[in-house]
Amino acid sequence: MLNNGSSTPLYIQLKQIITDDIKKGVYSPTAKLPTENELCTKYNVSRITVRKAILDLVEEGYLIRQQGKGTFVKSPKLKRELIAVNGYSEFMESTGKKPKHHVLSHDIIPASKPIAEKLQIQPESPVVELKRILYNDDQPLTFEVTHYPLDLFPGIDTFIADGVSMHDILKQQYKVVPTHNTKLLNVVYAQQEESKYLDCDIGDALFEIDKTAFTSNDQPIYCSLFLMHTNRVTFTINSPYT
């Protein structure tokens, strides 16, 4: 409990209690904190004290506030090698976490000109458009839109399901293994659709990654657009000294 007789300000004492609870797992990543009023009652302090402690913890990266929803424990940022070839499922397994993805939709559509150019196919050729949300624990990490050429992967839409690795489908069903890719990285701002799927505010900064994957003979096999909240991932680049 808080010590009113201590020379340490009450808000700092409260900060320490909350950070200790986070480290001990009392509040797990993405967990919602009690409301300001509930914390006031629990620790017998003013709302100003609670608010100061919460704001400091937000600035220090322990918590995140979502307008109209409350205050949540922030998941540690994932570190992702920008030029990595492995897919989401392989990456999550390499960190000791279980992959979790949710399929929003998958449809057969005619390829637009930009998609056709990336996949080196004719415009209007049939492609499967897959939209998914990829998670880190229970927090949305990535909103993904991927296109697969149907002529190269006939029937691929029948294998798509929640929890299924698309790289595994390519390897097991079509004997195709991506060996390298190109990526374009930009920063954009969340619109209504991204805000909904990534559980963030409209206007939040997002990483936008435009990726095309290739086989060893440079044949494009899919192209993806990934949107990721900048607070949830850090990208690294390992390169030889030149």
Swiss-Prot record:
GO molecular function: DNA binding; DNA-binding transcription factor activity
Leader sequence residues: none
The keyword Oxidoreductase belongs to this UniProt entry's keyword annotation: no
PANTHER family (UniProt xref): MANNOSYL-D-GLYCERATE TRANSPORT/METABOLISM SYSTEM REPRESSOR MNGR-RELATED (PTHR44846), MANNOSYL-D-GLYCERATE TRANSPORT_METABOLISM SYSTEM REPRESSOR MNGR-RELATED (PTHR44846:SF1)
Gene: yurK
Protein name per UniProt: Uncharacterized HTH-type transcriptional regulator YurK
Keywords in alphabetical order: DNA-binding, Transcription, Transcription regulation
DNA-binding region, residue range(s): 36-55
Start and end residues of each HTH gntR-type domain: 8-76
Domain of life the protein comes from: Bacteria
Source organism of the structure: Bacillus subtilis (strain 168)
Keyword Transcription regulation assigned: yes
One Gene Ontology term from the biological process aspect of the record: negative regulation of DNA-templated transcription
Cross-referenced SMART domains: HTH_GNTR (SM00345), UTRA (SM00866)
CDD domains, per the entry: WHTH_GntR
